[in-house]
Amino acid sequence: TTLLGIILNVLLADRGTYSWFGGMPPDDARRQIGSLLETPNFYHYLSAYNNLEITAAIRRRGLTDRDNVLKQVGLYERKDSKFQTFSLGMKQRLAIGAALLGGPKVLVLDEPTNGLDPAGITEVRELIRSLNKQGITIIIASHLLDEVEKVCTHVAILKKGELLLNGPVEKVLRSQDIIEVR
């Protein structure tokens, strides 16, 4: 979670460097990245469509993307439904939709299935796989190994800012290195 905050310029790093897209200036790079770092924050009494309209206006991008985004996240048929009528999985999919406004190349998600019931977890995992098949790079922070195995192609295991292990998921899971996760 801390790493995601740093790479999104929400938190300042106390050491180290990184760059996006071959060293693109940070403000330009940030426009290519969609993110969901916390619990979705929408107006309960507004429709999915109106909530995305507000989000697009605040971000100053993606206003014309609303229909497409709602189709991408499987909520187009419910675009006029109030947010308060959505299941937890639908709320999370709408939040991912908000992160997709403006057509980012990269999507950063912090614990995207946290607090969801099994049906919601399945919905979000399927959405993540679908978005990746569309060419969107997705970076996920998760403490759930099962989630990582089911939706990720590569994994990096960090402890207190230090990289312990990284590589393709299958290779890391077969590794002889023993990692104790607490």
Label every model-predicted segment.
Residues R15-A29:
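Conserved ABC transporter NBD signature motif
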Residues N166-G167:
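ABC ATPase "signature
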Residues L107-E111:
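Catalytic Walker B motif of ABC-type/P-loop ATPase nucleotide-binding domains
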Residues L8:
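Helix-to-loop junction immediately C-terminal to a conserved catalytic motif
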Residues E53, A57, L63-R78:
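Conserved ABC ATPase "signature" region
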